[in-house]
């Protein structure tokens, strides 16, 4: 993979992260927004690129397993997501934000292995769940909760 293709994938990571971040910051009003999501997606992409390409031609490395970096991304983003989950007056807050940060890292990993169509479709699905499903929950479940 040449530099231009890597730069294209990293740029797409920033773009797709911003798309999800815009929904979280400006539509949902959450504190984790465009910069956070763009950086999570970018970081996941670049670490995946490193795991794929960074050790090519290194024949003296024993037990090289590129999937270790992918596993590290999942764990690291889980730790980041745990930082946004809080307990406030017996109510857990931040679960959706944590899950969306974790999902966006998957988008970045998909880009890192070159699955651009999957990354775009995944981004669409994340925004759909956050925006449309969230709106439906507020509209119908919120009304149901007020009545009971």
Task: List where the protein language model places each region.
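Loop-to-transmembrane alpha-helix initiation sites
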Residues: 68-69, 113-125
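Short, non-helical or kinked segments that cap or interrupt transmembrane helices
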Residues: 26-40, 62-74, 88-102
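Amphipathic alpha-helical interface segments
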Residues: 91, 105, 123
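Interfacial segments of multi-pass membrane proteins
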Residues: 98-115
């Amino acid at each position: 993979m040449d530099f231009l293709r890597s730069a294209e994938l990293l740029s797409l990571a920033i773009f797709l992260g911003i798309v999800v971040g815009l929904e979280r910051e400006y539509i949902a009003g959450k504190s984790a927004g465009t910069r956070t999501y763009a950086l999570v997606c970018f970081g996941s992409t670049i670490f995946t690129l490193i795991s794929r390409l960074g050790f090519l031609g290194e024949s003296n490395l024993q037990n090289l397993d590129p999937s270790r970096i992918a596993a590290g991304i999942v764990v690291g983003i889980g730790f980041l997501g745990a930082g946004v989950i809080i307990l406030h007056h017996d109510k857990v807050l931040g679960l959706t934000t944590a899950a969306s940060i974790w999902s966006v890292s998957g988008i970045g990993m998909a880009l890192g292995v070159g699955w651009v169509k999957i990354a775009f479709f995944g981004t669409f699905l994340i925004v759909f769940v956050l925006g449309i499903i969230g709106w439906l929950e507020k509209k119908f479940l919120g009304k149901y909760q007020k009545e009971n």
